[in-house]
Amino acid sequence: AGAAILCRMCLDATIAPRALVSLNGALLPLPGIRHPSLMPLVRAAVSGEWLPRLFARRMGSDAEVERLLARTGSALDARGTELYARLSRTPAHTGAALAMMGHWDTRPLEADLPRLTAPLLLVVGAQDRMIFPGEATRVRRLVPAARIIQLPGLGHLAHEEAPARIGELVIAHARAQGVAVPS
């Protein structure tokens, strides 16, 4: 959500950064059931306590956590998997994530992206199964100042799979845009 929020803030002239980075960002409308008449039902379902509790309870199974991780296209180490499981088993966290997804509407952002002037780096895990890598190509067509770096073998959680590599890319992009980055 961070990249979409930052892009929106740039477009609304709330901020004027010299560089933006999107990590497997959901900048375009998500596929699936997004019909406007169904969205109030989706929002109602995710706003209550029962769905987050049910989801968190299902994540009590290590096998279910592994299935969820597999759907991201990412392969976390044992510690990363443990931390992901801990978060997934917390109703407050799952509730917040479900609420965010239930309220996600990037149609206005998609219409405005051609006006984005900040240099945008789209970092894409080639194995991402949540936000398909091809979405970055669509964003690049809309945003003249965008470029894509695709990372083979990494999924939606690329920042957790290869944090040092992601950090290097962010720093390199910032420096390329004249941002002073401490060594």
PLM segments and residue spans:
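Active-site acidic short loop of glycosyltransferases
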Residues: 15, 117-118, 144-145
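A conserved amphipathic alpha-helix that caps or lines the catalytic cleft of carbohydrate-
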Residues: 9-10, 140, 170
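Catalytic active-site module of serine/aspartate enzymes centered on a nucleophile-bearing elbow/loop
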Residues: 144-183
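Conserved alpha/beta-hydrolase catalytic His-Asp/Glu region
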Residues: 31-36, 53-115
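Short beta-strand/loop motif that positions the catalytic acidic residue
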Residues: 116, 122-124, 128
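Flexible "cap/lid" loop of the alpha/beta hydrolase fold
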Residues: 8-11, 15-49
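Conserved alpha/beta-hydrolase "acid-adjacent" motif
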Residues: 129-135
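Glycine-rich nucleophile elbow surrounding the catalytic serine of serine-hydrolase chemistry
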Residues: 1-8
